[in-house]
Amino acid sequence: MKKVRRKGSSGLSELSEKAREQLAQAELRKLRQQFRKMVDSRKSFNFRHQRMIAGQYKEIETLKAEQAETTMLLSLVKSPKNLDINQKNFMELRFLLQTKGDYEALISSMKVLLGELDDKIVQMERKITNQRQLFLRTQEANNPKRLQRQIHVLESRLNLVTVHFDTMLTSNSQLRKEIEDLLFEKAAYDHVYQQLQRRLQTQKKTMNVAIEQSAQAYEQRVEAMARMAAMKDRQQKDISQYNLEIRELERLYDHETKLKSFLLAKLNDRSEFEDQAKKQEDVKSKKLGKKGKGESFASYEVAHLRLLKLAENGDLNQLTEDFLAKEEKNFARFTYVTELNNDMETMHKKTQRIQDDIINLRSQQQTSHEGTRSILKQMEEKLRKTTQEADIYETKYKEMSKTLEYLKNSVEKMFKKINCDATEILGKLGESGKVTDINLQQYFAIIEKKTNDLLLLESFRRLQEAEGPDVDVPQPFVNPFWGGSALLKPPEPIRVVLPVFGADSFSDKLEEVDSPLDHSTLQQMVLENFLQRERTKELQDTMSEKGDEIRLKKKVIG
């Protein structure tokens, strides 16, 4: 074990020594590289330093040479010979400047003369072109076929313009009729609207009256119901009181019946006793025979004895008074019972009458409610129909008012676009310069008059175009009724152009067409002619520019 450990420690020491050697070699390499770099940098620094020093030496030498030259030049300048030469040069320069000013004045005067000559040349060329145009016109005027063709073309154009004018007039009259119809319809709708408003107000009033009546009927019903409830309560109280009184009376009646039965029993007993007494008296009378009036007295005595037996204290007066009092009480009770029976019958009749009245009131209330409901339903149906009609008429009125407003705005725009004079309308009282229902006809009349004038101007312009362009070119006129006329440009100012002679292609095309042309074909032909003219103008401009360049070159050479 010890040997193995020694071998391992020796191996580790060898490895550490090798690693140290490698590290030392690497550090040595790095140091050598750094040394080389420092040597190279030193060499380069020395080389640059030497170059800088050499450049500075060269600059010093050049500066010395320049200093020598400047000193020599200063010495030469200050010499009297050079001073004389400078004086001579100064005098020559002054003379040359004076001559330059004279020549410039001559050049400006010559330019003015050349401009005048150019103007004269332009005027002469214009005269030549006018003479040529007059010559061509005379030739064309003397040509009968050309004249017939021009007449045919002008007639076709006039026919188209008149047809267009007639269509515009018919459309204008139709629009005027439509506006009048719309105004009448508006007035009728306004009248109907006012009537419907009145009917609606009356319906609302009747509805309010019906509502008030129904409210009053409801209040009366509530009052009647309250009365009925009070009467029912009163009836129940009366019935309860009546029942109590009946019970009391029945109790009294039972008591009286018991008393009567008792009295009847007593009376029956008494009558039996009296019958027995009468029988005994009869027997005695039979026994005694015929006796006088004294025997009746004995009977009275017997009766008197019986009455004394019946009396409590032997007082017959008290007995009679008690009997009479009892009879009076019985009679009073009998009368009271009869009165109560009569009152019961009257109360029954009253309750029956009240019940009949309640039934009648309920039936009347039900019928009145049904009537008011039916009336309210009818009124609601009428109100719904009237509101629907009013809504329909209101929508129609809004549509008509929108169309009228659109027509008014279009008329006002057309009036302003064609520059119509509104002094006649504005001179009237209450006019504010806006198109209204009242002054619409007047605006139409002014627009119609202006369209007639514009069509006359258009026909005159077309006649002038057919005859040929004059010297004084008129102002451009834009026809509002033709779409192609807006594409035509106004005539440009005349420039000096090389004369180019050629036939008019547009007139030749019109001559080739035998039938009258419509608006679309005319517009197409005008556009083609316009494009062709633009091309020819561009060619003429290029040629004129070339001619101007040649003239300038000639002038410069001259």
Curated annotation (Swiss-Prot):
InterPro entries: ODA-DC/CCD, ODAD1_CC. Disruption phenotype: Male mice are infertile despite regular copulation. Display shortened sperm tails and malformed sperm heads and motionless spermatozoa. The 9+2 structure of the axoneme seems to be intact. Spermatozoa are able to activate oocytes when used in intracytoplasmic sperm injection (ICSI) and these embryos are able to develop to term. Signal peptide: none annotated. The keyword Cytoplasm does not apply. One of its GO terms (biological process) is spermatid development. Residues 10-44, 185-259, 369-414 form a coiled coil. Keywords: Coiled coil, Differentiation, Spermatogenesis. The keyword Coiled coil applies. Expressed in testis, brain, thymus and lung. Plays a role in spermiogenesis. Involved in the elongation of flagella and the formation of sperm heads. This is Coiled-coil domain-containing protein 63. It comes from Mus musculus (Mouse). The lineage of its organism: Eukaryota, Metazoa, Chordata, Craniata, Vertebrata. The gene is Ccdc63.
